[in-house]
């Protein structure tokens, strides 16, 4: 459901430092290009291969700095302050754990299982720390973001929620989505100011109903074609030798197509659900209790962009991946906005004057990214 029409870049620029009109959402934009990002991407790929993956940490920094810097709100881009060494150290710790785990699992299976259980206990803490790291290395107008969520909230949002959703075959997925967005949104800070969101479970279920309908309809179509070829499947079950070579080939093609359709159905449903839930959660969010956020992604358009991006990337053996990433970033940014209550210049001046809860010592002492 489209909640508001996109604003032109000119309109956004005019509102950069004045009072935002009532109901006027300032849209984000993405100023990068596929051609420009391709140069960064290809160097990242080549250096990652040459260094046997070590450079991937610095590749992540270069990629994020490009996308953050080209994500523009009110004429100013975001900044990404992480360093490659921080990301590399975190990855080396995780890599060392995996080596120890596999060694123990091979020679002392019980110890390996115990180490796995210990790791699972630490997952909520790692998730909370990862979100904290990502927030704290991000800034806008020289003011850092922060994340204050605890491991207990991460356990509910990222462990309990997915388990409940899986056990109920997705019926309680909206509840899990609500927990996740509330955990992230209610613990995010910009300077000393807090974000908050409380998405309606009923509205999320409306998005879920659309995805559920896609799955049911898709499975009915697959089931119908399977019924038409019931004789072939029945013969194959009774004895594969009874099938001719042509029928065996046809059966193989049908099975492959069935798998493709299965993943396509659930993939499309997941994308439709993701866009819908994002719209609900972002549009229910506020900043500093009075500035409203907005997301009005078109479910159909978002799904088409995501699927076509994957297809184009596969067909071109990955060479069009930069174009696909820029295409998605541009679309999502253009359908994300903020409505400021008051004079924008005064709002950001006050936030900058208050300062940030994140000190420079975080980058030197605590700042490691474990990839969660």
Predicted region positions:
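Long, contiguous internal "core" modules enriched in hydrophobic/ aromatic residues
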Residues: 124, 144-271, 275-276
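Selective recognition of hydrophobic, aromatic-rich stretches within alpha-helical transmembrane segments
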Residues: 49-63, 107-137, 166-187, 248-281, ...
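Alpha-helical transmembrane spans of integral membrane proteins, capturing the lipid-embedded, hydrophobic core
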Residues: 37, 41, 45, 49, ...
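Membrane-interface extramembranous regions at the lipid-water interface
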Residues: 3-43, 58-92, 129-158, 176-211, ...
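Short hydrophobic helical membrane-anchoring segments positioned at the boundary
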Residues: 313, 343-372
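Alpha-helical membrane-embedding segments
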Residues: 96-111, 147-160, 171-179, 215-233, ...
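Membrane-helix interface segments in multi-pass membrane proteins
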Residues: 2-6, 60, 101-119, 218-270, ...
